[in-house]
Amino acid sequence: MTGQSRIDRRGFLRNAGGAALGAAAAGSIAQLTPPSALAQEKFPARDINWIIYQAPGGSIDTTARIIQPYLEKQGVKTSLDYVLGAGGRVARTKLHTARPDGYVMMTESAPGAAIDEVIGRAGYKASEFIAIFGWSVVSWQLCVKKDSPIQTFQQFVDECHKRRVVVGTIGRSGSSHIQLAALQKELNLPFGMVHFEGSGKAYPAVMGGHVDAAISGPGSGSRMHESLHFLAITGEEREKALPDVPTLTELRFRVTPIDQIWYAMATPKVPEDRIATLSSAFAKAFEDKMLWEQMQKAGEYLKLLTRAQVEDMVAKQTEVIEKYKDVLG
């Protein structure tokens, strides 16, 4: 995130909250159809069920825990619900089939739902979920255990051509999987993959020598820097959480970056006024500088996204994913 973005975040948040409430005023009458109880009930009148699709300890879990008390200050109390399996597909299915009353939401790491849609293994489309608020756009890091004989990305490449190297993802058919697929395809690297449900399970496998390397987010990696060594960043720019780790581009390897977009999303057909309430609560929560400080201490650097921005980015990612459909089944 640029310095200017950080300076302007209050203006962004005011605009995001205002836009959300404006959308509610324009669309609430049309959206609030029977049952009439939804129109009359104060929202939220009870805890929101917040679905987390990766194991505790990873960045999706960590960021949700940091955000929770600030949302509660805005009148939105949440309880975390860990729904693991199939790279988030089990969790998305639960969200998709939930009652459309706004009492269930999920942290998404796009392009997860778009991948499910492209490979045809889910009964939903990415565009059917309703984006609430986004807070992060980050790339990936490739890591090995601290004392691994592989200490550079070039050594990783060389090792892949000598023997069977195994790399862990943080979810089958998830965005970490597709980024590794891009590495395999575009650099012609014949490594194998093992899939874990989040970095909380992938990192122990690396440190225990059960896999040679893993791909995961820079924030969770920074929290494990004493036990891990980082080979490269997949994005176009270095990550603030791991400022000393070079990008693949710097190392003269050209690979399509598949960035992660983190945002909260809701069940399809939730009334617009309820989406506006949640969006406004998130926007106001992110006005608190203490939240930003806690995120940075955890190695998570924020880039705030409106609903429209999230929807546009997800649509563009869906087009890129089509290139790797054959390796994600």
For every predicted segment, state its role.
Residues 34-50, 76, 99-104, 157-166, ...:
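Immediate post-signal peptide segment of exported/extracytoplasmic ligand-binding proteins
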Residues 137, 219-287, 319:
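C-terminal lobe and pocket-closing loops
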Residues 45, 71-75, 252-259, 292-294:
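A short C-terminal helix-loop "cap" of Rossmann-like NAD(P)-dependent dehydrogenase/epimerase domains
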Residues 38-128, 172-176, 188-215, 220-224, ...:
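N-terminal (or domain-start) structured segment
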